[in-house]
Amino acid sequence: LFELRGEMSLLKTVLPNVVQSIRAFRVADLQDEAARLGQHFLYAYCADALTKQQVLAGIAEAFHFPKHFGKNFDALADCLTDLTFKAGPQPGFLVVLEQIPNTPKFDKEARETLLDVFRDAADFWGEKKVPFRVFYSFQ
């Protein structure tokens, strides 16, 4: 199931639709694996963001969301699911959210809400049998 052209996948122990800590995975290896599998690789480095708007703007820019993206969690959910689904068949997604901040204006609750949006997107794509794996790290 996780084998491709006789090679074992880096992701053999990772469910196809999951949000998890990046742990021992390296970003470059995940990017290579996404390319090998023909999946979209989406990467956002969030360490410089201090507020929800800055975190969401950084993700929107990194993921090439439309200019009209409305820097809120509902807009993020729409871009990760419906808008992308309407664009046509998708091969799969490997997402890395690196250094999600913990600041007074982006606290633990905001981080959990952000990850919940990505969990909901993983469920959405899972129902469509499209892999959607998210790896994250916190500051």
Task: Put a short name on every predicted segment.
Residues 2-139:
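Positively charged, polar, low-complexity stretches
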